[in-house]
Amino acid sequence: MSVTLHTDVGDIKIEVFCERTPKTCENFLALCASNYYNGCVFHRNIKGFMVQTGDPTGTGRGGSSIWAKKFEDEYSEYLKHNVRGVVSMANNGPNTNGSQFFITYGKQPHLDMKYTVFGKVIDGLETLDELEKLPVNEKTYRPLNDVHIKDITIHANPFAQ
């Protein structure tokens, strides 16, 4: 199961872990299928750490799940922030997942069991390199020039009916 994020700086193909994180993947794939993420900016970009998106307001404070409420974390001892390109839900504390997600630029073990890992980049690491190089506001970490998710291709959706 995978999706491709088509961004202003290139494509990122992500394998999603539906068996280990079914609720998170159901939410993510449904948001992808409904074009929810189309036009979202990468609103937070910290070199060596991660890049974040998934908020249609572009502020980093918005976004909602398909259930119109926050949903619970799905942690697994097998899913860790142990390499570049791990994809996780962003949150404001335990069980506060919505629509925002981030992609790591490297190992981030301090995030394990705090953020739900639901995927990994399987193609497009060069696009991740381009995102990491973007100049940002030093206080907010927002890229100086907006970079968007243009649209998303779903390669197979086990939740589609």
UniProtKB/Swiss-Prot annotation:
Molecular function GO terms recorded: peptidyl-prolyl cis-trans isomerase activity
Omega-N-methylarginine modifications at: 61
UniProt KW keywords: Acetylation, Isomerase, Methylation, mRNA processing, mRNA splicing, Rotamase, Spliceosome
Superkingdom of origin organism: Eukaryota
Pfam families with a match to the protein in the record: Pro_isomerase
EC id: 5.2.1.8
Record family assignment: Belongs to the cyclophilin-type PPIase family. PPIL3 subfamily.
Function of the molecule: PPIases accelerate the folding of proteins. It catalyzes the cis-trans isomerization of proline imidic peptide bonds in oligopeptides. May be involved in pre-mRNA splicing.
Protein name: Peptidyl-prolyl cis-trans isomerase-like 3
